[in-house]
Every structure is written in C-alpha cells, then in structure tokens.
C-alpha cells in the first residue's frame, strides 16, 4: 500500500547508470517519500530537462544544487532525510558534468553535507581511477556502493 511504501523508505534505494542517474536525480526531486538513498552512477542533472539546461546554460554549474534543494524542501524533507552516493570514473565522459554538479552541491552546506568518508555526510562522490563509461565501471560501482549503503542502513537502524 502507499502507507507501507512511505513507512519503509529507509530501506529503499534508487540507483541508475547513466541516463538512469539522471532519473535518480529527478526521483530525488519528486519521490523522497519512497526513497532515502540515491545512487547516481555517471550522470548529472545537466543531461536532464533540456529547457532547464538551456535556461541556465550548459557550463553554468550554479543551478543544480538550488534546483535539488528547492525540490527537497517542497516535499517537506531536510538534510537529515537522504543520502546520495555518486560514483563515476576519471576517464568517463560524464566526469566533467558530474563534478560540476557535486561542486555546486558543496556550495549549499545547509542542505548538502559533503564528506569523503561515506558514513558521515549526506552525500559523497567516489571516483574510480581510469574508469570509463562502460559495463566494467558499472559493475565496479555496484560492487563498491552496496557495502556503503548497507552501512548507512545499519547505522540508521541503530539510531
């Protein structure tokens, strides 16, 4: 039921690669009642709604974090209500736009608490050295993300 889905959001993850990563960001903007954890692999909001991107500019990194923050607040959630684990490769063609978005999110510390220690903040970027935009990288990201997410869920249950 709808109530059960909402009540169990702390055990639900939305994950995607690469256009699935764009979908992941958009689900964070409209479906937080169903998911606490968001794991975009090699994709950013820059690849999303062309109207929004055209409005703000392709190389303007100053709109994605505000767009996310406004959507989170509009849903009635705060910085304590989500965790984002972003992964990409240093040779992935998406690296540039992912990094631009993460850098913009770091400029909004009231909502996005960046920490390279993936169990302290509410969002983390992990980079895979020399990984490209391919199946091998995706498998590597899943392999590394699942234990981190498991730790996050366990930590949450102990509170």
What residues fall within each predicted segment?
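Non-catalytic cap/lid and distal C-terminal segments of serine-dependent acyl enzymes
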Residues: 1-159
């Amino acid at each position: 039921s709808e109530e059960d889905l909402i009540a169990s959001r702390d055990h639900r993850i939305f994950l995607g690669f690469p256009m699935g990563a764009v979908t992941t960001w958009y689900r964070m903007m409209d479906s937080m009642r169903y998911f606490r954890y968001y794991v975009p692999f090699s994709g950013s909001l820059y690849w999303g709604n062309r109207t929004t991107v055209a409005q703000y500019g392709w190389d303007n990194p100053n709109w994605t974090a505000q767009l996310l923050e406004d959507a989170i607040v509009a849903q009635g959630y705060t910085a304590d209500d989500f965790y984002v684990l972003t992964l990409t490769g240093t040779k992935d063609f998406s690296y540039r736009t992912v990094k631009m978005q993460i850098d913009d999110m770091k400029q909004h510390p009231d909502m996005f608490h960046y920490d390279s220690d993936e169990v302290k903040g509410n969002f983390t970027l992990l980079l895979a050295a020399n990984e490209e935009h391919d199946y091998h990288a995706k498998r590597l990201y899943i392999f590394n993300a699942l234990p981190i997410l498991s730790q996050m869920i366990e930590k949450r249950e102990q509170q």
